[in-house]
UniProtKB/Swiss-Prot annotation:
Catalytic activity, EC: 2.4.99.28
Covalent S-S links between cysteines: none
PANTHER family referenced in this protein's UniProt entry, alphabetically: BIOSYNTHETIC PEPTIDOGLYCAN TRANSGLYCOSYLASE (PTHR30400:SF0), MONOFUNCTIONAL BIOSYNTHETIC PEPTIDOGLYCAN TRANSGLYCOSYLASE (PTHR30400)
Main location: membrane
Organism for this UniProt entry: Pseudomonas putida (strain ATCC 47054 / DSM 6125 / CFBP 8728 / NCIMB 11950 / KT2440)
Name of protein: Biosynthetic peptidoglycan transglycosylase
Any single Pfam family the record assigns to this protein: Transgly
Pathway: Cell wall biogenesis; peptidoglycan biosynthesis
Subcellular localization: Cell inner membrane
Sequence similarity: Belongs to the glycosyltransferase 51 family.
GO annotation terms (biological process): cell wall organization; peptidoglycan biosynthetic process; regulation of cell shape
Regions crossing the membrane: 12-31
Length: 236
């Protein structure tokens, strides 16, 4: 009985490993049709009796404002070009902060956020964190940095039912994602920690202050020229 159970578990694990690798490889080239977060939001809206229509239009890398690309990096993950999916010093600092009490601080890189939003459910269990680490490693192994950021920008939540840069640009500013200004990009990046609570088009004092900080960080990073550091040639 025990040996049979072990064989079945081993077989299931092998299928999971193989399936997840294939899925990540497919999404290296094919735009994901949706994300786990989008499904979760849709289900939540049904449960709450307030169904929502999801807004999302996939835009390729070249059709997204460079200002938004840099703004997201400046606000969310300034070591994006150099790390391999995990910012260990930031993780250690977050753990130390959380142990001292107070508000829980995260340290997720853009790659980790892609893994979580694309494949996983919300939560803080160690099991989910383990799956997040697995998918993060696969994404970093098989995708270029440009591809990671492209998928992130097309999957990020920017309001109730609003997903991706194009839908966000249209919803908040009435423009295409390719025409976002630096200020608009900074405001979109400023709400990413809590896009349902905060609005990019109607910024609170906090969001306005954070957007100003992000603009300064964008300048320190070198502006759009920073994107030249996203070395796609290091990928398989």
């Amino acid at each position: 009985m025990l040996s049979t159970l072990i064989r079945r578990l081993s077989r299931a694990l092998l299928w999971f490993v193989a399936g997840s690798i294939v899925l990540v490889l497919v999404f290296r080239w094919v735009p994901p049709p949706g994300t786990a977060l989008m499904v979760e939001r849709k289900v939540q809206s049904w449960v709450n009796g307030e169904p929502i229509d999801l807004q999302r239009d996939w835009e390729p890398w070249e059709n997204i404002s460079d200002e938004l690309k840099v703004a997201v990096i400046a606000g969310e993950d300034q070591k994006f070009a150099s790390h391999w999916g995990f910012d260990l010093p930031a993780i250690q600092a977050a753990l130390a902060h959380n142990e001292r009490g107070g508000n829980i601080r995260g340290a997720s890189t853009l790659t980790q956020q892609v893994a979580k939003n694309l494949f996983l459910w919300s939560g803080r269990s160690w099991f989910r964190k383990g799956l997040e680490a697995w998918f993060t490693a696969l994404i970093e192994l098989f995708w270029s940095k440009e591809r990671i950021l492209e998928v992130y920008l097309n999957s990020a939540e920017w309001g109730k039912g609003v997903f991706g840069a194009q839908a966000a640009a249209r919803y908040h500013f009435g423009v295409d994602a390719s025409r976002l200004s630096r200020q608009q990009a900074a405001q979109l990046a400023a709400v990413l920690p809590s896009p349902i609570k905060w609005s990019a088009s109607r910024p609170s004092a906090y969001v306005a202050s954070r957007a100003g900080w992000i603009r300064r960080q964008m300048s320190q990073l070198g502006g759009p020229s920073y994107l030249m550091q996203l070395d796609s040639s290091r990928k398989l």
